[in-house]
Amino acid sequence: DWSSDVCSSDLNMAENKIKTIGVLTSGGDAPGMNAAIRAVVRRGLSSGLNVKGIYKGYSGLLNEEIRDMTARDVSDTIERGGTILYTARCAEMRTEEGQQQAAEICRKHGIDGLVVIGGDGSFAGAQKLANLGINTIGLPGTIDLDIACTEYTIGFDTAVNTAMEAIDKVRDTSTSHERCSIIEVMGRNAGYLAVWCGIANGAEDILIPEKYDYD
C-alpha cells in the first residue's frame, strides 16, 4: 500500500547525499501547484542543491523533457493558477517497463530525489519509483482531498471557495423562485468537497459517495 509507505518515509538529504532533485506535477492540475513548485525550487537552491524541472508529468519524464531550474524560472508565479511545469496523464507509468524506464532516466540525469506534486495516481507512480531506488517525496495536490495520511491538500481550499461563490448565486435565484436546487460538485469518489460546501451553505441534505451506493 503506497499510502503507508509514503507516510512512514523519512528522507534526510545529508544522510542520503542528495545533490540534485527533480520536481514534476502530474494528473489533474490544482490551484496552488505553482506556489508549491516555487517553494521546492527556491528551498532547493538555497540548500545548495541542483533543481531540475520535469515538464508534462511522468510523460515528460519518459520523454526526457527535463531542464535546470533557477530562481528566475519561478518568479511571478506564486499567484498564477495551473502549473508552469504543465501536466499530463501517463498510461506508460502503469506498466513495469515504463516504471523501469522512468527510474533509469532519473539516474541518467543525476536526479537523486524526486518531488511529485499530484493526487493518488501520481503518488502511486512515485511509490513505484521509490521501490526502484529513487528517493521520492509526494506533495498532495488535488481538489478532492482524497489522499491518505493528510488532512489537507493543495487546491482544496480554493476549490471550496470557488464552489461557494457559484452556490451563493444559485441559492439567490432558488430563493427568489421558491425552488429547491440540487447542486453537484467535484470530488470523484470522495465527498469532502460536498460536505464542506454543504455545511458552509446550510444545505438541507448532503449526498456523498461514502454514504450512498450509487451503483
Language-model features: where?
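Glycine-rich oxoanion-binding loops at beta->alpha junctions
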Residues: S4, A14-E15, L61-V116, T153-A166
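Accessory alpha-helical/coil subdomains and C-terminal extensions
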Residues: V116-G118, K128, N135, F156-H177, ...
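Short, ordered loop/turn segments at secondary-structure junctions
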Residues: S26-D29, I54-G60, R89-C90, G119-G121, ...
